[in-house]
Amino acid sequence: MELSRRRFLQGVGALGGVAASGFSVDAIAQAAAGAKKGKAGAKAAIEIRKVKSGCAICPNFCGIEATVVNGIVRTIYPDAARADFYNHGICPKGASGMFNTYDPYRLKKPLRRTNPKKGPNEDPRWVEMSWEEAFSTVAAKLKKIKDEDPRKLIWQHGQGKYLIGEEFAKAWTQAFGTPNMTHRTTACEAARHVADELTWAGHGILPDLKYSKLLLNFGANYYEAEQAARWLDWQTMQSIDKGLKTVVVEPRLSGVAAKADEWVPVRPGKDVVMLLAMAKVLIDAGTIDEPFLVEYTNAPQLVDAAGVVLKDKDGKTPLVWDTVSGGAKPYTQGVKPALKGSYNADGKTYRTAFQVLVDGVKEITPQYAEEVADVPATTITRLAQTFAKEARIGETIEIDGQTLRYRPAVLYTFRGLSAKEHGVQGWRAGLILNMLVGNIDAVGGLILGGAYGHPEYFDVSKCEYPPKRVDLAQSVFFPYANHHIAQTPNFTVQDPKAVGLPYVPEMQIYYASNRAVSIPNSWRQFEGLTKTFNVVIDVLMTETAWYADIVLPDKTYLESWHYAPTRSTPDTGHNAIRQPMTNPYNLEHDAFSILWELSKRLGMRDQFATEINKAWKLKEVLVKTGRDYTPREIVETIWADKTKKDFSVALDQGFVGRKKDTKSKYLSGVEKSFKGPDKAKMKLYADQLIDTFYKVEDVAKKNSLASIDLAKLKIAYSPLPTRDHAFPTPHREAKDYPFYLITHKRMYRNQSGFTVNNVILNQALGKDAATNTVQINARTATELKIKSGETVTIETRVGKINGTAQVVQGVRPDTIAVSYHYGQWSAGYSPESRKGTAINQVLEYHPDLISGHNSFNDTKCKLYKA
């Protein structure tokens, strides 16, 4: 049966009326049951079940307990038992999660496109397919590609990373033979991760709020949307009662800034200069932890005039200036490294890495930072002095019989410092400030998630050319893109030869990813989707699905099995599952069973099973070859290997938790990996960046890569943050655009495309949740004669878009703020879902050249009445 756009909307309209008329779970669920059976469901005896599981709507993975009455999910509450290990509550998005499952607009059958033209106004002319026909069609296409060149397949996922587990996607693409699996981290926190990796060879940080007395928060808005929000919000409140002071530095008065002791409205993109000025205040006053810098970091290592660290005869071991012997030596037993100064060795002059930092911030005074960042010099000085004072440099504390470094002041960020053209350098500046007071892995400081877990991050990048991957990760174009690059595949497929890709991609599979609307300059992304055969696995007819050739319906997190990801805290960790509790539309498959079936039809089932064991790092209980697995059986296998617990524990409790002892929390990270002689060192000075720059320069010149701007790249690849990193491309070039355009996340739709139709979030919570607005400072609005509720136009060098003005005090006068997640246009959404401004459409595209992270907060704009 052929389904036109009108027929598609009519098909969901019968059930859509239920959603439009009220918010009863009963009404929607019974309508869904009626749709499944073809008639109204008969009354049954009342059966009430309590089901413990995990939320998968955002990357907090909160523990939940659902009440299921006669197969209908009636309520979702936080699992009280999980409070000791992570979340004490859940957000409205999680509490209303059943409305995503009972959404009448959901995809229910496989669909095939019959209109070859693709575009927002093109009717795909969908035709329903059986699962057999869908599998046969997709498998035939995949087999042809696998036989010819497996690299021609691209797999992309977004929130799908958490719905079935990225490990399954890794295993399947590895078995298939394509290097092109790409996830969404460059739309989230990649720059922060890479800054961590360059500095301490791992990623994942949290402030030790249980003991902290001062939190300097540069744009981590965990009262609205953040990865660890459901622990950070609760722990912050507990610690405030015990004396914690919070200072939030960001251009917009966010939820977390509104509840802080102080809000510092820094000019967008200029916080790196503010941080460097604070570092200068600490250095000039001598309020730094010199023993920490010497013993744990590479601050004493000798650096030549070209920025390269002096090495021993082996070409690998860094040298320091030994104050005992008066010569350049490796930091071994008996050597006492100099922290500061310039020294002569082998007829050349070298400075310590710390001295390079000192010289680099010499002119970045608080007064200079005031001019750039528009934060008073007195405020910058006071914050630096307070940070040093509260860090209590040199103090120790005894906990559980262990004498530990005590540094109860911490600087933290999420997207605030990282979602920019120089995002890696932004957070590197924050890490340096933390290192100066010695709070890394200290009580009350910044707790690292596995210091030196990946020593390869300290190496010079591979700088691949020609690139192996379509996203260009770890190639000469993005040498330290360790977390894939979400946005580049759809650019690359438009002109593979331009970047030297030695093959032409033909097919893309998208799983739970609405990539094109999620990143800057969205319409360029959609152009890429016209170049490939696209298969989309999702729960809704997203904009990406609108450009698909085959659409396969997926199950929601309340309908499917998963060995679920979880969030740890500085004190706890836990393992969990997610289990099904309803299936109102009687759907046959989730993404795992789709992958399993395709692997069978491609003759690679056993390879898939073998790769699953590798991807999940299973050691004792393995996925066996020569047999099939249901989603539940796979989860049982992983649970048994990871927890050594009977599966009945998973079914009854949903998780098993563990609490970290004092030694594992404070003494197994930097103390074990970096402290003292004969150890690797944290990189205050990221020398691998300058070494990588010289390698890129060589490759670019040998291959005549004119698209690589070496001057721009040298700024990006500085071993230390500099003032240049406060001036991204739009700030330097868009002189005729007076306003800074910044973006932010809101809880209601953050990182979860399938909540776009949630009737509770769209209608029941009020107008503030129903759409987004263009936030304008009251003074600016007066000057422009703009009032709240009026339609305004935002104009950038990319294009124009309209939105509804909201006049506020809580944003800088030179700044316009618009949230993501709104303004979507797919005909597969309810009318209530298609409201607001899709700000990504007009954001400039200037990704971080180190990590590939998208620059969501660098665009300049004009603003006027529509």
Task: For the regions a language model picked out, list residue spans one by one.
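Extended redox/cofactor-interaction regions of prokaryotic respiratory oxidoreductases
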Residues: 167-247, 273, 334-341, 353, ...
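Flexible glycine/proline-rich, aromatic-decorated loop/lid segments
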Residues: 255, 543-577
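Active-site phosphate/pyrophosphate-binding segments
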Residues: 353-355, 366-484
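Long, contiguous, secondary-structure-rich segments that constitute the structural scaffold
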Residues: 580-581, 590-643, 648, 752, ...
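N-terminal leader/propeptide and maturation segments of large enzyme subunits in energy/redox metabolism
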Residues: 113-133, 287-381, 578-704, 741, ...
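N-terminal export/assembly segments and adjacent metallocofactor-ligating motifs
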Residues: 1-291, 295-338, 376, 509, ...
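Glycine-rich phosphate/diphosphate-binding loops that line cofactor/substrate pockets in enzymes
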Residues: 135-153, 205-214, 360, 383-410, ...
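Short beta-alpha connecting loops at secondary-structure transitions
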Residues: 260-266, 559, 573-584
